[in-house]
């Protein structure tokens, strides 16, 4: 049975208007912030800005924008690196982790998934996404499958970061975004190229396709969780998440489809109680950025007065009109100035305290960089920095924004990897899995993030192992050789391989390890037997002269017994 999905366009648009109204206060404040922090992100937050127009009217100092871009670039390059694999797939069942064939299959799947990410526009869109997350505290990224070049092939991924003014959303009972409205403008000509749209447009709109193809109209795309659908059907109308495009002007449903997973990764830096939109470092830095810009504006005004000051001119001391042009000549009445021509024109000193302004600006800039965590994420250029000092900086960084990384992992990275894995699995882009015990069929696959920051968060176990080895070395030096029996060296090696992200093909199968050890034991036993035989042969060689003399001695003894018998 196919479930008939009926959509009430009017109800959807009313829900969209309510959601947009709840977001309006955020839009107003975010627009005010972005004019000082990152003006280029302010487009479409509250109306569209004309293309090519000036955006830095209120910005007199770029310290806030510079600090935010450094944080965003650091997060993007560290968490989603195009040059270093930033995630690993592992089975949730620990028993499966001891099966090298299965682990190699998961590693192959992870490598193919990572290659698909690198072949897409993820790195480019992730950089924009982290900018929104840093300045605004909220970002949304659309994750779709790209069109395949040939039928039956996997087409790859396509990502798009949404501007803050393009969308509004709703949360489920667990605080995760599960419904998103995206508003965008398109032309009638572009809409006519989308299959099925022009047939559903009213007659007036179809006429504009022919007569005014460049005219734009608004479309709302909503993705929502379906409450009623047939899980046995695989068509678009029976997927967990519904999708529909609505022409708002005519209230016409242009297209209806679905997704197997929610296609948007909506991330919040942090949330205030009762709010669904995030707040980030930009909110914390904004008061200082606003003060810094105002102080920089006043400093420029004071500087202009110092460079080109107001002049005090003695009344009627200059004969004719005064000129301030280079190489200009002014006739001075000597009697009026007492033959001191400098008294005729004098600058008006403002008495501005420029040093106070410089000190205040430096203090504000330091606070702004602290708000954007530049002191923790950006490693200073220090060639003599030791590994211990670098590890210490990573630990401080982890403590300062560790909770934020947790939100990024859950709301962005895990959603991207999970959806990407599911899309490639459905498309047959992975090799067939190896056989596993029946009780583990259908086990869950977990994601382990492998970026430098993620490894820093797991480095405590590695440090504990290193400290144990130092202690064990000391015990061995003291003659306590039995201390080594307390630890499982094989399990320790596997733990270190997992913590450091060692490729699975470098870790041997337990059966293979047992075979190698058995062969070594047999070889050692054979070697021991050869050594014993050699020692025996050496002993036999030393006894040969004595054996050679044995017959002669025996003959002498026999003669002695014979003579004794004759005498009796």
Residue ranges and their predicted role:
Residues 30, 75-76, 125-134, 219, ...:
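Generic hydrophobic, helix-prone segments enriched in Leu/Val/Ile
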Residues 1-29, 42, 48, 312-568:
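C-terminal anchoring/interaction modules
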